[in-house]
Structure formats: C-alpha cells, structure tokens
Design a protein with these regions (language model features):
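Intrinsically disordered, low-complexity segments enriched in small/flexible residues
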Residues: 105-151
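Conserved catalytic cores of soluble enzyme domains
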Residues: 1-114
C-alpha cells in the first residue's frame, strides 16, 4: 500500500488523481490513506471511508462504543453523504456508473486543486485538537467539525 501511496503523491504533481469510493465494502486502513492523498474524492451513498472499519473499532472499543451492525449509525459517521457534508470528500453522487464517470471526467478536466487536502494538515490538526474524545461523537458533531475555511 505504501507504494500505491507514493505513486499517488508522485502522479498528482502532474495531473489530478481521482478516487471513487462506491459500493458497500468501504475504504478503510491504508487504502483510506491512499484515497485521502488523491486530488479529488468521489463517494456514493453506500461508500464508507475511515481509518478503521466498523468491525475493527467494535473489536477494539466494544459494541457499546461502536456497534458495527448498526448500519444507519455507521453511515451517519462514515458514509458518503456524511463525508461530503463534512467536507472530507469533494463530490457525493448517486451509485450510478454514468454519474460517477461524469464526475471523474469533470475533475480530470478541471485540473489540479489549488491545495491538496493532505497538504492542508494544519487545518485538520487544529480542528481535531478541540474534539472531546471522552464522548462518542454525534453525526452532527462530525458534520460541523471541519466546516469553515480550509485553505
């Protein structure tokens, strides 16, 4: 996975690298880091994005902390609609091949972003420092965490 991540960083200097997170499998672990390194992220309703998957979090923290079978809760935290509303992805589209293709082509035509998300780490670190980790975050808290000026 590290080689994939290095290739993304090398390629994005020259042209946009677009990640699509669709379907019900989700994008977790090292591949979520690879996705975050891309120039643009596109997600669908069924897509999920997070550093750890629901089952891993449940295994480590317990079902009281994170119930991996509670699908509405999982999507309310890591789903495509939530990630788009949180500003962590660039586009939220229907899980439709033509819509996904159209969005990918739009980003390729648009060119490189002014600032890649992964280069803006100070913004994210500053916001994360204010998070109360003693309580389970609500979907609304997740949505509002990164709102505001990002560059």
């Amino acid at each position: 996975i590290a080689e994939i991540q290095a290739a993304i960083v090398a390629l994005r200097q020259y042209q946009p690298v677009v990640a699509v997170i669709a379907g019900s499998v989700g994008c977790f672990g090292g591949m979520s880091i690879a996705a975050a390194l891309c120039s643009y992220l596109i997600m669908t309703q069924e897509g999920r994005l997070g550093l750890n998957g629901p089952q891993v979090i449940e295994q480590e923290a317990g079902v009281q902390e994170y119930d991996s079978k509670d699908r509405p809760f999982i999507w309310s935290i890591t789903g495509g609609q939530q990630r788009a509303a949180s500003g962590l992805v660039d586009a939220y589209v229907e899980d439709d091949r033509q819509q996904i293709k159209q969005q990918v082509l739009q980003y390729l035509t648009q060119g490189l972003p002014d600032l890649h998300r992964s280069s803006n780490y100070d913004f994210y670190l500053n916001h994360l420092q204010g998070v109360d980790t003693t309580e389970q975050a609500t979907p609304l808290q997740v949505r509002t965490l990164y709102q505001g000026e990002q560059a």
